[in-house]
C-alpha cells in the first residue's frame, strides 16, 4: 500500500468525475469553477496530512501471566488492554469499573472490552446456561456492528470453552428473512435471524439506538429481556457504547434517556450495570479527562472517575529507533525514486529499497530492521509525534536533520518531497516480527485527505464568474453570493434565489435560500446572466 499515492489518486478521480459531470456551457464559468476547486490552498481538498506514531507498549511476560481473566487473548496484550482487563474483570468478586477507552486507531479498543465480557458470559454459562442478555453493545452505524459481529463470531468459534456455550445476536433492524440470515452461531457470523434472537435470547446483543428503543417499547420484543425483567439476579451487567464521542447534542440526550429507560424497565439499580465507552483520543488539556468523565456520566447515568479513563502508552522514540546512520541516500539517487505512471506497487518498492536500503529484495521485516537504524526515521517520528502535518510542514520541520538540510540546499524542495514520500512508502511496507511469530506494522502511519462538500460553494452575483466557500464569506465584502445551480442537460448555470409574491427583490440570505430549495418551495427561482431585466 502506498498511502500518499492512493490519496492523490482519490483526489484526481474525484476531480475528473466532477469535470465529467459539470460541463458548463460558458467557458469562462468552467475555467473559474475548476480553478476554484483545484486551488492548492483553498480548493475542494485539504491535505494529504500525515500521522506517524511508534507502536504501543506491550504488557510484560509477568503481567501476561497474571491477567485476571480466564478467557484471554492468544497474543500479548498492550499495556492499555491489560489495564482494561483489570478494570473490567469480575474475578474473585471484583466489581467491574466504569471504563472509557480513548486509545488511537489500531490500538485494539474492541479487545479491551471483548475478553472481559466473554469471560463474564463464560462463567455465567460454565455449568448451565443462564438465560438472559448479559451484555449490550450499541453502535452508531450498522456497518460497524456487522464488522464487529464477524470478529466476535471468530473469537467465540475458535475457543472450545466458548463455542456452543456463549452466543451473540445482531439486532439492527434486519434479520426477518429466515433463509438469508443465520439462526445459529458460525465461524464467521453470529445469530442474525430476528425470530431466533427472540427465541434463544443471546448472551451478547449487538444493536443500535433505534432497535434497542423498539426492544424496550414493543410487546413482541419483550422476550429479549427474559432473565432480567422478572428476576432479582440480573444477567445484564455490561453496556458498551462504541464511538461514544459521536453521541453529541440532541442525540446524546436521546441515548442518555434510552439507557435510563433500560435500567428502569429491568429494575437495574445504580452501580450494577457497568458502562464502557470507546472514544477518539482526548486532548492534552489539563481538564480533558474531567470533561470526558462528566460527559460520560451524563450519558450513562453512572459515576466516572478520572482513573477510569484509559489512555494509550507508546514506546518512546529513542527506545524504538537505535540510530546507526542518517539513512538518506544521495539526492541524484532520490530523484530516481519518484513514482512513475507505469510503476506497480512492487516495482516502486523494489526501487526505493535498492537506493535507500541497498537491498532491492528486502522483505518487510528486513526493511523494518533497517528503518529502525536511521536517524532520519527518528527525526520524522519526533516531528510527527504530536499531531498531523502536511508534506510541506514535515519538510520545514525536518530542517534540524543535517543531511536533510543539505539535501534541500544542494538540490530543491521537490527532491526533499520525494525523499519524504519514499520514507513513508517504506514505513507502510515494513513490518515488525512479534515473539509469537506474527507480524504487525512497523509504525502506525495514517494519511488523511479532507474533502469539502460541493454544496458549500457559492457564486458571487456579478458578470465575471467568481466562487467562494460559504464558510469563507467576508462580512466586510458588500458583494452578494448565492448558491449556484447547474443543468446537466444543457450546461447552463447561475444562481438560486427566492422571491415571495410580496417582495420587490430576490432574497440574498444563503440560509433562507437553501431551506426554500430543500423544501421545494414554489417561490424558488433559477437566475443567470442571460435573463432579461
What are these regions (language model features)?
Residues 249-250:
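Conserved D-loop-proximal element of ABC-family nucleotide-binding domains
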Residues 1-89, 104-107, 114-138, 149-155, ...:
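Helicase motor interdomain insertion/brace
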Residues 243:
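Active-site cavity-forming subdomains of large catalytic enzyme subunits
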